[in-house]
Amino acid sequence: VVNIPPDLGVVLDVSPPPLRGLNIYGVLRFDRKDLELSADWIMVHGRLEVGTPQEPFRQRAVITLTGNNPEEDQMGMGTKVLGVMGGVLELHGEPRRGWTKLAQSTPRGAREIAVLEASGWRVGDRIVLASTDYDPRQAEVRTIVAISGNTLTLDRPLDFPHFGEVTFGVDQRGEVGLLSRNVVVQGDEASAGSGFGGHIMAMMGSVMRISGVELRRMGQRNRLARYPVHWHLVGEARGQYIKHSSIHESFNRCITIHATSGLEVVGNVAYDAVGHCYFLEDGAETQNLLEGNLGILTRRPEASQGEQPVIPTDKNPATFWITHPANIVRNNVAAGSDGVGFWYALPENPTGPSATTTIWPRRTPLGEFSGNVAHSSWDGLMVDRGPNRDTLEPETTVYNPRTYPADTQNQYNDAVNPPVVAEFKNFTAYKHRGNAIWLRGLNHKVVGARLADNAIGVTFASRATTLEDSLIVGDSANKGFPRNWEFRGADGRSLPRPWASGAGPIQDNFPIRGFEFYDGKVGFRNVEFVNFQPLEIHNAQGAYRTVREAGALSYLRFTSFDIDSRNFAQGARFTNAKAVYLPPRPEPTPEELSKGQSADGYRGSVFIDLDGSVSGRRGHAVVLNHPFLLDTSCEVRPEWNAGVCGHGYARLHIRSESGENIGPVSLTREDGGRPVFRMWGAPNNPRFFGATVIKGRAYTLEASGGLPRRLRLRLEDSEPGDFIHLALPYSGEPYIYRDYWIDNSNRLAQAASRAEFEASSGDRYWSEGGWLYLKLRVKNEVGRDWAVLDVCSSDLCR
């Protein structure tokens, strides 16, 4: 072990023999010549300098970390570590362009590629081409053997085609990253077999500035806090950064920001990493800048390779894992992940060493999310499923940005704690097997999105959320490269769901959708939809053929959860696109019910075509083709499996407040052919039911489990004066209270006659022949959009 004392400055001008360890209390500065330094571990208490920001190192420097005893622990940082313990680490290699894009498409088997900008790249450099298909493993590494302008000759042919065009307005030019740098920090060659690589770690009081550096065989498999580059509990770190560097063949993440704020992570390239790659750890990390970074092939841990998730969500890894919204995430590219491109995984409060109840990420306004690109993953942008504070398992997460995030008492009070709209700007996403965008929460806005070739473009599990000024393409000119076992389109294109299900019918006829309504109130304004048409698909041999359906607009397929009848479309434009497709869904089978798949919400699908840009009928509703939602005045459009109706629609909620299981329940509309809608309840909850109803109509409610002691009926998504009539079988004297006020002064009286009941404002009921007749009517109060009746079998619902 070599110790450099505090009062000594050393210039390294020769490559020393391998060291057991190196403690730098003074200064160690690399001379301007090719040098190698090898040690089990290096600890910087003073200063280690390889180049400076003003004078980058232009020779070749290689630092190899060799520690092989996993039980060794140097100052809490283990071994095989370049650690910074209150010192200064300056690593500055030659400034080089970190990544570019293809200038044109490149076929499989090609040995030449044309890129937008190759200045500064050299023969002998290693580069990585990102996948431009659904499979992130179509990324491939090559070595440059010749350069002519912006044309690169590679050492061997490409195994996959790589797309290089702007197609239908969506930029799908594949990224090409430079892996080679002249300053290298690496784990030794044994790291490749053991997964026990090197790592760089800065502790509190340290300063770390890295630029133009190559990190390879770094990170330590399955080990917490052992990542290629890691700011650990540093706190305020303005002026510190990692820029224009490369990280590849990482056994555990890429760049970790842990309880550290003010960092700059700019222009880096990361390739082939296990677990979340660009990683903000606890949820207390703020004011960090992530700009112009590229991440290619973010892998889930493979148990067969001895890999385990460090935290539970590594099983679904994100190229960018963001745990606090108050950061700047700008112009980055997530180019292929087994999980997610950009995941805002917000905990309720920070976790781990940062745990506190004074910080509320789920209610903090968004810093910036703009100009980012995601492709070749399952999901592109995910704002949901943040870590549970105790288990770190993903949980349903509502992102509700507020002016005062810590005001827990008024988190939904707009007057006292005004919302702050979170704008996700100019996002490009293509080739996702799931969603390009999935948001959960309220007061979100997606503006300027450009999406293509996704199973689903946009789903908002939200309210007060809109998509605006955007473009969504179903099938683009990027046809990809189906594997020989995959189903594919008749035109040869790869599919987001290319596999067969065990039951026989292939999963690929899962219809692609552009904008998917769910929850609500949500909608879109000024959005263009292109190329949403049915597509014949077949297996590789062509023996099995079917049709994959498509619709620019749809609903979350077969959801059992509640929806909002005010969901809306405005300013839609369609080019070669079926405007709507709502897949048929009959009543659930016993097997589906055993899995909580009632599809109650989906079977009530409705949205409002505000300006007629979808249906040609301004202000009309588009509803699922179900008799309960239609009457003879509606226009049924079979190719949509939907009807266009001029009625107003609302939602009726039916709840057993006294806890009895009453399901399934049925509603019969008392007109026409008396159509019936049966409900089995929200998943595994036979006490709460929801149905889409036509305003002003009469319905009969029957519960197979009998009526509960206290039944709550709520009409919502309405306006003052809206009503429905409701009849239900009832014996005995009812105690009925209006709008949540359970008091005898608010108990409904029985009308003197059926006519008086019909004409009432909702403050009377009628009983006759074993039937109870109710009128759910919204009071004439500004802003009121609901009406409630509690029907009880005893005084004051006791």
Where do the PLM segments sit?
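A generic structural motif
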Residues: 111-116, 144-162, 768-777
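C-terminal accessory/interaction regions of large nucleic acid-associated machines
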Residues: 469-476, 482-798
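C-terminal, active-site-flanking charged/polar segments
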Residues: 143-160, 361-378, 390, 394-406, ...
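Extracellular beta-helix/beta-solenoid repeat scaffolds
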Residues: 2-101, 121, 125-135, 139-142, ...
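Short, exposed beta-strand/loop patches in secreted or surface proteins that constitute
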Residues: 2, 100-107, 143-146, 754-767
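Acidic/polar low-complexity surface segments
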Residues: 51-79, 95-103, 179-193, 215-240, ...
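Solvent-exposed loop/turn tips at the surfaces of repeat/solenoid architectures
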Residues: 22, 27, 33, 40-42, ...
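Extracellular beta-sheet-rich ligand-binding/adhesion modules
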Residues: 1-80, 86-94, 98-103, 107-123, ...
